[in-house]
Amino acid sequence: MSFRKKKLKPPAGSQFIINDSIMSYIDRTKTLIRMIGCKNQYIKARMKDKTFFYTKQFRTAKNKFFFHLYHWEATHINVDHYICTCHPIFWGSIGQKLRRSA
């Protein structure tokens, strides 16, 4: 089953704030966020310049959650203001190179 470009409707009441449990990892080419302990499928994160980006999570072999950023211009993350939500986005994939560097 392919999840590429799959559109999903956000469920009601799916937003909640996550704070200190978030670890961020940013790669210059792919721009990834690593989060531990979030079970929601989607995340909406607020940048310090008040722009938003949307991500879709998937599991790696190490059982860690990774989020592929929809907002490609994201360069700096405000870790204190992550908001989990559901949003239709593009399903991205992570390569072995990023998995080794994470």
From Swiss-Prot:
This is Uncharacterized protein YOL118C. It comes from Saccharomyces cerevisiae (strain ATCC 204508 / S288c).
